[in-house]
From Swiss-Prot:
Coiled coil: none annotated. InterPro entries: Chaperone_TCP-1, Cpn60/GroEL/TCP-1, GroEL-like_apical_dom_sf, GROEL-like_equatorial_sf, TCP-1-like_intermed_sf. The keyword Zinc does not apply. Pfam families: Cpn60_TCP1. This is T-complex protein 1 subunit theta. GO terms for molecular function: ATP binding; ATP-dependent protein folding chaperone. GO terms for cellular component: cytoplasm. It comes from Encephalitozoon cuniculi (strain GB-M1). Belongs to the TCP-1 chaperonin family. It is found in: Cytoplasm. Component of the T-complex protein 1 (TCP1) complex. The gene is CCT8. Transmembrane segments: none annotated.
């Protein structure tokens, strides 16, 4: 029986046509989301200006920041966001991943439109996924990082930062700290000047001054308290009966004497605490020429402890000899209208990048770019070496050529799948600019893009759950003025 000439044949044909239309619509939706960041790829130096749901102004060229602040409801676009977050863990390659997804979907829709079933194309794409490592390894360049050679670090970060001034200051900070850790390279944002005025300063910088009269210290011992320098107050209320003025004076003197003895018993030259500093304590600390600094963040308290050494004490008590740290210098400096304090340790090297710009949104983006550069190096450098590939689109062109050559030696659907990947990679422009990309980031982006597109064409339907409607309005008592009889 010839099904094609029957009513059943028409139903099958219509079903296949509906499936193509559905995937075309879904693919177009995902491509619209991808096009949000398409113009940011390469050396465009463009950014997106975003006003999020809280009214905050953001300026960013990173897909993770853009998608996090743009409300989306489509399940596949949300899945795309999850893959972008996975790329951010590696540090680089998120924009390349998004653009490649868009191009792969376009090529896949053309192939499916010519008769290939979506499920079949998806399985062929997953097969091609396994060969990426072999093809990419042929284009790998091993590069050694040398802290003494700034150019060896610049070579890696040039394609990541895409900003000459930002690249220079990050490279200088890394070469001085001899580390890629964000704990060894801190960032201080100053809302004045421009990025060209940014510089590197030794030590950890805080945007506040010491509390007392003493603003500077050299070669001193430190004591860190995770509590306020304040008179302890009990939880329960109590009543003290005083009959005469002399009793009140005696009580006050006893309290002052106790505080004075406690301050004198603290043998540290620099005292760091996490709460308020009482005026009585501050008065005795000033007389003892002790520097007092307040840190409100528990994370910064932990960092300063790692920098200076010693222990964090939870109660206000005289520290043991082994509980105190050592500081080489505590100094203050001024930038714009704000004064800052820096702590320098002789045992551990920490450097702070003082980033300057008059616009807060630009400052925040520069900070994100610095963190991105540090993540790229810390996640991808192993044994002092990092894998690189030719940048400026040359890696994509060569990989495209490799996939197209392989497709020529194959037949059937597999040939179409390889050709689809080759064409998608071939859409990226290339130039002769001497820049390099991170090998691991490129390979992960290729794998994730194929995985995402395969998932898209394996999804028969998607569901969106509605959030529960919470009745939080006031109660309407319509008969409030009627008396009960």
């Amino acid at each position: 029986m010839d099904i094609g000439q029957t009513h059943l044949g028409g139903l099958i044909s219509n079903s296949q046509q509906d499936e193509k239309v559905r995937y075309h619509i879904v693919g177009s939706r995902v491509r619209m989301a991808c096009n949000l960041v398409k113009s940011l790829y390469g050396g465009s130096h463009r950014s997106k200006l975003i006003v999020n749901g809280y009214g905050q102004i953001l300026l960013s060229s990173q897909p993770g920041v853009i998608y996090d602040n743009v409300k989306v409801n489509h399940p596949l676009v949300k899945l795309l966001q999850e893959y972008v977050k996975k790329m951010d863990v590696i540090g680089d390659g998120a924009t390349f991943f998004v653009v490649l997804v868009s191009e792969l979907i376009q090529e896949a829709i053309d192939v499916i439109g010519r008769g290939m079933k979506p499920a079949c194309f998806s399985s062929l794409l997953r097969e091609a996924h396994k060969e990426i490592d072999d093809l990419g390894r042929e284009l790998l360049v091993e590069h050694r990082i040398d802290f003494e050679d700034k150019e060896s670090i610049s070579m890696v970060l040039r394609g990541v930062l895409k900003d000459k001034w930002l690249e220079e200051i990050v490279v200088e900070g890394i070469s001085l700290a001899r580390s890629f850790s964000s704990e060894s390279i801190r960032v201080c944002k100053v809302a004045c000047g421009s990025v060209e005025d940014s510089y590197v300063v030794e030590g950890m910088v805080f945007n506040r001054l010491p509390e007392g009269e003493v603003k500077h210290a050299r070669q001193g011992r430190t004591s860190i308290y995770n509590c306020p320098l304040d008179i302890s107050r009990t939880e329960l209320k109590g009543t003290v009966l005083m009959r005469t003025a002399s009793e009140l004076l005696s009580f006050s003197k006893e309290e002052n004497k106790r505080i004075k003895e406690l301050v004198e018993s603290i043998g540290a030259d620099v005292i760091i605490c996490s709460g308020k500093v009482d005026k009585i304590y501050l008065d005795f600390l000033n007389k003892g020429r002790k520097l007092v600094f307040r840190i409100t963040s528990k994370y910064d308290l932990r960092r300063i402890r790692e920098l200076l050494g010693g222990h964090i004490l939870s109660t206000l008590e005289p520290p043991a000899e082994g509980s105190m740290g050592v500081v080489s210098e505590v100094a203050t400096f001024r930038e714009g209208s704000t004064e800052y304090t820096k702590f320098i340790s002789g045992s551990k090297k920490v450097y702070t990048l003082v980033l300057k710009n008059s616009v807060q949104a630009v400052l925040d983006e520069h900070e994100r770019m610095v963190q991105k550069a540090l993540v790229v190096l810390s996640k991808n450098v192993s044994g002092g070496k990092i894998g690189l590939v030719d940048g400026a689109g040359r890696f994509e062109r060569r990989l495209s050529k490799a996939f197209l050559e392989r497709s020529a030696g194959l037949s059937g659907g597999k040939s179409l799948a390889y050709k689809c990947i080759g064409k998608a990679l071939g859409t990226f422009g290339s130039s002769d600019v001497e820049v390099y990309d991170i090998y691991n980031a490129k390979i992960k982006a290729l794998k994730y893009s194929m995985e995402f597109v395969s998932t898209l064409f394996e999804t028969s339907d998607y569901l969106i759950g509605r959030p529960e409607a919470l009745n939080i309005g006031p109660r309407n008592n319509q008969h409030w003025d009627e008396e009960d009889h």
